Amino acid sequence: YKRQDKDGIVDDYIIYMLNALRQNASEIVAVVNGTLENKSKDKLLSITNNVIERENKGFDVWAYKTAIDQYGWEKLVKFDEMIMMNFTIMGPVYPLNEMFECMDAKDLDFWGVTKFHKYENGDPFGTIKVGYIPEHIQSHFIAVRNSMIKSKQFQNYWNKMGEINDYRDAVGKHEAMFTKRFSEMGFKWDVYADMGEEYNNHPILCATREMIEKKRCPFFKRRSFMQSYDNIISDTFGQSALEAYNYIDQNTDYDVDMIWQNILRLENQADIKKNMQLNYILSSKSSNIDAGIIKARKIALVMHCYFEDLTEYCLHYASMMPESADIYITVPCEKNKEIVEQAFKQLNNNVQVIVIQNRGRDVSALLVATKTVSYTHLRAHET
């Protein structure tokens, strides 16, 4: 199981996944590209005593090779099956024994959970020797059976694995070609959750709910919730992540808080907002809120008024606040302070104008100049 994290943290979804795997695997090796914080390393050690921390190079490919080299072929050929799996999938949303029992009944040499359909319109990575993306098992989960583990072809593949310098190398030298290479050698393969030609090239991303609901796919991609929106909108209406999230939340036992724990720590909030359709339109009509409730609230409005000619605009905005709200305006010089103070005299609010250095734009106005404004229940920020 390969994992990497820029902060060296192992989130709860990883532990949940490994605990589920432990019920179906006799041994687990956790390979970390990078270093772990002590608390996170202890988490992994609670699952397996074989935790490898290595330099963050070679992507998944060399993480797997590192584990293979540690075991050696003499030991590996004694296993019925070897799984190569990474952290880019979350789950499981169903018991994994369902999948393993289903695939155990099939006469195969290697198998996976999902596949990427053939893409004939060229090689977008520029590293795939056949010039297109062949149909292949997606590399987030590939299981190799003993018949293939003990083969010279498979052993030579890993013994002679070249350097992987970037993501394009990883795709061209391993991910996109692994299935085609060994299939042409006569090894039989299949996937557990196959939508066939019903959907596009990447069903686990673009038809996630259908994969879970109709094909009982136990996993989903963490990238679903924060990928480039341009990628997903070319194949869908943008609904895939939210539909999948709602289905998982409402129809499975999977704790969706584990999704948020990871993506909020690591990913761009703008990407999360787009993929999860977190768009809200406030009503133009005022609600009948008890004036006493508003008065009891401690509200601060922080405004950065850099240009003198924005004074009237800021005043208009601030005048919409309840009189109980405190108003803090940051300005770049004493001259602007005098102008703003004069303009804001007409308000009954507690108004404070603060001169700040011309550094950090509006962010410093919020995080530095008004950092002591910590007593509020609600806080607004306007530039």
Each model region followed by its residue ranges:
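ER/Golgi luminal nucleotide-sugar-dependent glycosyltransferases, focusing on the catalytic module
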Residues: 2-382
